Design a protein with these regions (language model features):
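A compositional/biophysical signature of low hydrophobicity enriched in polar/charged and small residues
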Residues: 1-136
Length: 136
């Protein structure tokens, strides 16, 4: 979306639209710009939500886990959650075989992991990749 297209959508001229966009970036409201890829076309069409529990609750184990997952490319999202599980991970793999390999060689090798429960996504129904914003 160009600044000109955005300006037309918000009914402003390009200069104030550009200024507002830059201000929102500076103030941290806009964190970045991303292309949204079709996981199936990238040969990573299997989505798994993995609910994970640490071996025990300690800041050190939590920190170790959060550091350990940063460079694991199959983990595309990670949320620290309340309730029965400590974290929910969104994992993208090619198929069941590659997911099993991922669990054996990557997630299963993180010392702080105590238990995990995998939920396999059958169909993505909604994914807006955004945050709702009330205008006005």
């Amino acid at each position: 979306l160009t600044v000109k297209e955005l300006a037309m959508r918000v009914n402003l001229s390009t200069s104030p639209t550009f200024d507002r966009q830059k201000r929102l970036e500076r103030e941290g409201f806009i964190k970045g710009y991303h292309a949204i890829l079709d996981a199936k076309k990238t040969d990573n069409g299997m989505t798994v939500l993995c609910n994970m529990r640490l071996k025990r609750h300690s800041q050190m184990l939590m920190d170790d886990f959060m550091v350990a997952i940063q460079d694991i490319e199959e983990i595309t999202e990670c949320y620290n959650t309340s309730g029965e599980y400590d974290f929910t991970l969104k994992i993208q793999t090619r198929d069941m075989e590659s997911y099993q390999e991922f669990m054996r060689t990557k997630l299963g090798n993180i010392d702080s992991v105590g238990y995990f429960h995998s939920v396999f996504v059958m169909k993505e129904v909604k994914n807006t990749h955004g945050v709702p914003v009330k205008l006005g």
